[in-house]
Amino acid sequence: MMKIVIYHSNECDPKRCTSIKLQKQNKVAITHNMRKIPYNAIVLDAEADKAVSREDREKITKYGLSALDCSWKKLKKSSFNFKSKKNHRLLPFLVAANPVNYGKPCILSSAEALSAALYIVGYKDEARDLMNSFKWGPHFITLNENLLEAYSEAKNSTEIVEVQNEFLGGK
């Protein structure tokens, strides 16, 4: 599997933290040092301007995928420190299946976000493998399957946004 590195800000409940669980299963690496995030990795960032898409697959394969694990309530403050990396990507509209934010649009756990990004770029088996680490995990894929499939067929960020807007009733 490609390299997945999570910058962990220690703002969440360790017992419920999806990143810590994935690390215990050797599926991701956790760092508390920004410099440990691979330089050209795709960085999932809820404040990014560009959506993750199939065109990011090569970079993820070569350099890895990274995410910021922080409290949604402290996102602005935590993500400010995260801005030094360059390949920031936003996830399109998806619905959370984790027990903390179940049914909430766009408020995904780190594991859900990583899984969604992998699915969208075409690493569907790897996405399912991450979600299989949680009792509720497979339901995330099922709940969002139509959207994830449509997003994975989009060629680039622009098409991802078009799929999202069509789903949400926009143009």
Curated annotation (Swiss-Prot):
UniProt subcellular location: Cytoplasm
GO CC annotation: cytoplasm
Catalytic activity: an N(1)-methylpseudouridine in rRNA + S-adenosyl-L-methionine = N(1)-methyl-N(3)-[(3S)-3-amino-3-carboxypropyl]pseudouridine in rRNA + S-methyl-5'-thioadenosine + H(+)
Keyword NADP included in the entry's annotation: no
Keyword terms, alphabetized: Cytoplasm, Ribosome biogenesis, rRNA processing, S-adenosyl-L-methionine, Transferase
Keyword Signal: no
Name of the top EC class for this enzyme: transferase
InterPro entries: RNaseL-inhib-like_metal-bd_dom (IPR007209), Tsr3-like (IPR022968), Tsr3_C (IPR007177)
Disulfide feature: none
Enzyme Commission number, as recorded: 2.5.1.157
Molecular function per GO: 18S rRNA aminocarboxypropyltransferase activity; S-adenosyl-L-methionine binding
Job of this protein: Aminocarboxypropyltransferase that catalyzes the aminocarboxypropyl transfer on pseudouridine corresponding to position 914 in M.jannaschii 16S rRNA. It constitutes the last step in biosynthesis of the hypermodified N1-methyl-N3-(3-amino-3-carboxypropyl) pseudouridine (m1acp3-Psi).
HAMAP family: TSR3
Family: Belongs to the TDD superfamily. TSR3 family.
Protein name: 16S rRNA aminocarboxypropyltransferase
Species of origin: Methanosphaera stadtmanae (strain ATCC 43021 / DSM 3091 / JCM 11832 / MCB-3)
